[in-house]
Amino acid sequence: MSEFQKVVVIDAKGHLLGRLASVVAKQLLGGQKVVVVRCEELNISGHFFRNKLKYLAYLRKACRYNPSRGAFHFRAPSRIFQKAVRGMLPHKTARGQAALEHLQAVEGIPPPFDKQKRVVVPAALRVLRLKPGRKYCTVGRLSSEVGWKYNDIVAKLEERRKVKSAAFYQAKLAKQKKIASAKEASPVNQKLSQFGY
């Protein structure tokens, strides 16, 4: 993401949560608008049980005499990612708030973004940054175990999207094949047109 674009759509699948958040925070401070899709497929290093215990300890942090005053603990993967990015921004200043407004994080790949080019961040990919054999877990599983109710719905919508996407890709390949064969036949057609065919 060296050059500035209007909007960058990042596919979060297979990325490490903290590493991706740091890259996104840096881009936001530079004025770049960033959309992060498939937040439920983000990875966290360390085995699942350890991460769940850490998250449950975080959930216990509250105001003793009136918990509705805060702190607020979001369970959705997109909100967990936004909170991670917020911690890397000066969010109490006008500059930090403006940067945070340029971030959009969603579960799955909803309609505006399923037709757009998605990118990955090599510096944050688990297969490149985590040692082979190390334990890791997904944010989606963690969220669903601490109170996020929409894991099944997002999975169902993703299956539908993948079927549509595969059909579109096959149609695109067929169209490219036709264009290629037409280009190959063009010299022959020119020769035939000289003789009135």
Swiss-Prot record:
**In this chain, where does the modification Phosphoserine occur?**
S193
Q: Which GO terms describe its cellular component?
A: cytosol; cytosolic large ribosomal subunit; preribosome; ribosome
UniProt superkingdom: Eukaryota
Query: Which SUPFAM superfamilies does UniProt cross-reference here?
Result: Ribosomal protein L13 (SSF52161)
The entry lists its GO molecular-function terms as:
mRNA binding; structural constituent of ribosome
Alphabetically, which GO biological process terms does the record hold?
cytoplasmic translation; negative regulation of translation
Keyword annotations for this protein?
A: Cytoplasm, Phosphoprotein, Ribonucleoprotein, Ribosomal protein
Q: Which cell locations does it reside in?
A: Cytoplasm
Miscellaneous: There are 3 genes for uL13 in S.pombe.
What is the protein's quaternary organization? Component of the large ribosomal subunit (LSU). Mature yeast ribosomes consist of a small (40S) and a large (60S) subunit. The 40S small subunit contains 1 molecule of ribosomal RNA (18S rRNA) and at least 33 different proteins. The large 60S subunit contains 3 rRNA molecules (25S, 5.8S and 5S rRNA) and at least 46 different proteins.
Q: What does this protein do?
A: Component of the ribosome, a large ribonucleoprotein complex responsible for the synthesis of proteins in the cell. The small ribosomal subunit (SSU) binds messenger RNAs (mRNAs) and translates the encoded message by selecting cognate aminoacyl-transfer RNA (tRNA) molecules. The large subunit (LSU) contains the ribosomal catalytic site termed the peptidyl transferase center (PTC), which catalyzes the formation of peptide bonds, thereby polymerizing the amino acids delivered by tRNAs into a polypeptide chain.
Official protein name in the record: Large ribosomal subunit protein uL13B
